[in-house]
């Protein structure tokens, strides 16, 4: 997404069917959850001034995933695939509409043994399940109005052996897909439940009103290695990030972590990161289009009341390292590491007007966000939460967020556009912390000639106050509290070229698409944080590629489709800095090739073959949270799709 830090989905509005789907988008936006894309029918990506429709994050963009709709007639589909690393995926859907009633039920299963291996070649994979059901009733223009009521229910879980523990530079060069013995107990379990009751009213005069009542619940317990000890004093403890950042200096800790040295006692501290999240709310929007002489005016407005929260109840268990195996030495007391609840209540609303006259289109909108946050820290001394000891930290933000965009067709094939809007992200529950605010400007050119589409956009995100986050995943302490970065600048260029040079009457199509993004970042003031250390004016923001390129070549015929893709990412900083990048603070550039073949063997039956990382290149994707981590090695996956 445009001009935002790569910290999970923390700086984008993540939605499913127009509903905020992150576990707690206001109080804990960086939580680990993302809907399964394999069950989606489409994905909408919105950037620029149109973001006033969506919030609370209005700088980097919005992603709206559209789930499988209730079909208009009896429909079913089944697809399954299997391939490298015992990776298997199965998806089945069935639905129908009879008269005013309709339904859709689907199930998705995805599992793999994973491509990372430890010494005994034990568990390192994942298993995921996803179930969604929809039930709908539609009337047929009762008194000039059509009503559609739909109930959506969803359940998902994950059981995986993922870890924060990466590799040292030396070990990555020798065996990039290896796992250390200290990650043996790392395990993640999640449960997700969603429910949405929707009502759509469509009048004969074109008025459309959509209302949603929603509730989401998410539980996760990520049991993972956090620290290494060689004694009980504070200075005798190191985080795994500190150990792998300098394994030579911390050689004693590193040898325990890797199983090369035995230690009887609390040598390896494994944290039960137990958290519960909820989000609930009600929202409604109305839209209508009028003809005004030779022009058209479309007005859309909406309002939402939302509540969400995060409940942390965590402890550390101490393990010994004996003969390369972890042995439980002392279990921790529940709630002794973190014992707090953070909640948020938010009112938001917007109005968006689009006026179109001849070749000119003007879009202007205004959004309002009013959020109240509170953190209740019951402390480690009150695990029962009696309230005898409690630290309460409130915060709030109220903002108006305007945006305007202009599009003009010079000729039918060529148009220019520009836009400006106010960017916003809510603060965390830290006393007197400011929200993120920015002024975002874009301007571009689009050319669409038969078989050819070209687009170039320049953007400038000028932050009056950027927020950083104290995430373990980003090298911080893991409090998830945000901190004020201050003024910053993110600017760049996005370019897209797609073409199909084949004559229209040809049965074979050749589609080519090339995209390139250049991003330049700069922080404008000095500050110090636990996540980034000492930062100076002029430093670049970490984990944002300066150069990124993607290319696709597709050949399509009646029976066979072939697609070859290439993606290139340039060198990227992992910590703030300027000038030449230090090797230990760099993600080296890499180029990855992928390919897909689809063959229709019968009406409704398609065979698929998918290859990831054809050259089997071992490349680094991150140096955080703790050590170097490799991207997907070469993987070959075959499958079948059946529609009926």
Give the predicted meaning of each segment.
Residues 1-23:
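Extracytoplasmic beta-strand/coil segments of soluble accessory domains associated
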Residues 19-47:
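Short acidic/polar hinge/loop motifs at secondary-structure boundaries
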Residues 75, 82-111, 119-163, 187-203, ...:
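Transmembrane beta-barrel wall of Gram-negative outer-membrane proteins
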Residues 142-150, 189-380:
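Face-selective signature of the C-terminal outer-membrane beta-barrel domain
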Residues 208-226, 409, 415-419, 435-502, ...:
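Membrane-embedded beta-barrel scaffold of Gram-negative outer-membrane proteins
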Residues 277, 294-308, 333, 337-463, ...:
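Structural signature of Gram-negative outer-membrane beta-barrels, strongest in the C-terminal barrel
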Residues 292-293, 356-359, 460, 481-577, ...:
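Gram-negative outer-membrane beta-barrel transporters
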Residues 464, 502, 509-512, 567-577, ...:
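C-terminal beta-signal and adjacent terminal beta-strands/loops
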């Amino acid at each position: 997404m445009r001009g935002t830090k790569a910290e999970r989905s923390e700086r984008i509005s993540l939605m499913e069917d127009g509903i905020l789907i992150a576990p707690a988008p206001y109080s804990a936006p960086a939580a680990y959850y993302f809907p399964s894309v394999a069950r989606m029918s489409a994905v909408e990506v919105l950037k620029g001034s149109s973001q006033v429709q969506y919030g609370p994050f209005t700088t980097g963009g919005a992603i709206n995933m559209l789930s499988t709709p209730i079909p208009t007639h009896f429909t079913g589909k089944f697809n399954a695939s299997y391939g490298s690393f015992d990776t298997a995926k199965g998806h089945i859907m069935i639905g129908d509409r009879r008269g005013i009633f309709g339904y859709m039920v689907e199930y998705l299963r995805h599992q793999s043994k994973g491509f990372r291996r430890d010494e005994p070649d034990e568990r390192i994979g994942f298993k995921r399940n996803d179930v969604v059901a929809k039930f709908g009733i539609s009337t047929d223009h009762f008194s000039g109005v059509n009503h559609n009521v739909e109930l959506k229910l969803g359940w998902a879980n994950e059981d995986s052996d993922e870890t924060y523990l990466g590799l040292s530079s030396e070990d990555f060069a020798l065996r990039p897909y290896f796992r250390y013995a200290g990650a043996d107990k790392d395990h993640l379990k999640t449960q997700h439940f969603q429910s949405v009751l929707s009502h759509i009213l469509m009048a004969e005069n074109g008025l459309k009103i959509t209302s949603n009542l929603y509730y989401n619940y998410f539980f996760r317990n990520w049991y993972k290695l956090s620290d290494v000890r060689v004694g009980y004093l504070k200075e005798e403890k190191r985080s795994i990030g500190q150990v792998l950042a300098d394994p030579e200096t911390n050689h004693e800790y590193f040898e325990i972590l890797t199983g090369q040295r035995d230690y009887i006692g609390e040598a390896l501290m494994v944290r039960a990161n137990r958290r519960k999240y909820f989000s609930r709310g009600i929202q409604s929007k109305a839209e209508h289009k009028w003809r005004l002489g030779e022009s058209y005016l479309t007005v859309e407005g909406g309002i939402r009341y939302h509540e969400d929260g995060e409940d942390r109840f965590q402890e550390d268990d101490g393990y010994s390292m004996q003969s390369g195996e972890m042995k439980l030495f002392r279990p921790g007391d529940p709630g002794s590491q973190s014992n707090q609840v953070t909640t948020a209540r938010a009112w938001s609303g917007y109005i968006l007007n689009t006026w179109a006259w001849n070749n000119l289109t003007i879009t202007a909108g205004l959004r309002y966000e009013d959020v109240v946050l509170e953190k209740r820290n019951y402390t480690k001394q009150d695990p029962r939460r009696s309230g005898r000891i409690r630290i309460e930290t409130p915060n709030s933000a109220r903002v108006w967020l305007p945006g305007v965009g202009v599009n003009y067709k010079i000729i039918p094939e060529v148009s220019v556009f520009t836009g400006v809007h106010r960017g916003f992200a809510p603060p965390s529950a830290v006393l007197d912390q400011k929200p993120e605010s920015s002024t975002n400007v874009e301007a571009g050119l689009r050319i669409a000639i038969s078989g050819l589409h070209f687009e170039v956009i320049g953007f400038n995100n000028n932050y009056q106050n950027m927020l950083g986050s104290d995430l373990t995943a980003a090298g911080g302490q893991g409090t998830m509290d945000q901190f004020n970065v201050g003024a910053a600048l993110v600017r760049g260029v996005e370019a897209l070229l797609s073409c199909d040079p084949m004559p229209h009457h040809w049965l074979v199509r050749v589609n080519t698409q090339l995209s390139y993004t250049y991003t330049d970042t700069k922080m404008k003031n000095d500050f110090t944080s636990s996540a980034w250390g000492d930062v100076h004016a002029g430093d670049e923001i970490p984990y944002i590629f300066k150069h990124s390129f993607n290319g696709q070549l597709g050949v399509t015929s009646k029976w066979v489709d072939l697609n070859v893709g290439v993606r290139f990412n340039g060198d990227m900083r992992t910590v703030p800095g300027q000038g030449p990048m230090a090797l230990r603070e760099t993600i080296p550039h890499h180029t990855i090739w992928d390919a897909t073949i689809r063959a229709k063997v019968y009406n409704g039956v398609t065979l698929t073959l998918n290859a990831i990382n054809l050259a089997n290149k071992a490349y680094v994707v991150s140096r955080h949270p703790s050590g170097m981590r490799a991207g997907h090695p070469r993987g070959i996956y075959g499958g079948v799709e059946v529609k009926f």
